């Protein structure tokens, strides 16, 4: 498939599996176009959080900082699994110095989760706390 076809699937499909597959392929085929689309989708509150987590996973380490403001500055609460994915990517992908400015916002978002939600991502949060000395 060519990049245009993959982009059409991402934008027009109602099938989340097809959208995810197309996003992964587009990230491998034409990364710069994928990044534009990913940033667009990450800014939208109504986009499925699992799809947003997949987009984050496809973004290369050098660009993860471009993603964080899209997610952390919106008013809608971030689902626990998406917040866990953000923490995971910050620990393994971002340089520690660059990621530090997002720590207070991530910690604040974590504190707003319910006890069950916190428990579901506790492992990521504990690693995150240890790495950033919270």
Set out the residue ranges of the language-model regions.
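Alpha-solenoid helical repeat architecture
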Residues: 10-14, 42-46, 59, 75-79, ...
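Amphipathic alpha-helical scaffolding segments comprising HEAT/armadillo-like alpha-solenoid repeats
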Residues: 1-10, 29-43, 64-76, 96-108, ...
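Extended amphipathic alpha-helical coiled-coil/heptad-repeat regions
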Residues: 102-105, 109-126
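Structural detector for internal amphipathic alpha-helices that build alpha-solenoid repeat scaffolds
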Residues: 17-29, 40, 50-64, 73, ...
């Amino acid at each position: 498939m060519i990049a245009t076809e993959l982009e059409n699937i991402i934008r027009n499909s109602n099938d989340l599996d097809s959208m995810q597959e197309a996003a992964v392929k587009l990230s491998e085929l034409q990364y710069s176009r994928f990044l534009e689309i990913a940033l667009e989708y990450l800014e939208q509150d109504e986009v499925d959080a699992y799809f947003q987590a997949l987009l984050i996973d496809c973004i290369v380490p050098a660009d993860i900082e471009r993603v964080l403001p899209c997610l952390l500055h919106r008013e809608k609460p971030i689902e626990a699994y998406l917040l866990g994915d953000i923490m995971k990517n910050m620990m393994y992908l971002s340089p520690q110095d660059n990621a530090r400015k997002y720590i207070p916002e991530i910690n604040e978002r974590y504190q707003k989760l319910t006890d069950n939600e916190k428990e579901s991502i506790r492992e990521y949060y504990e690693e995150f706390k240890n790495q950033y000395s919270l």
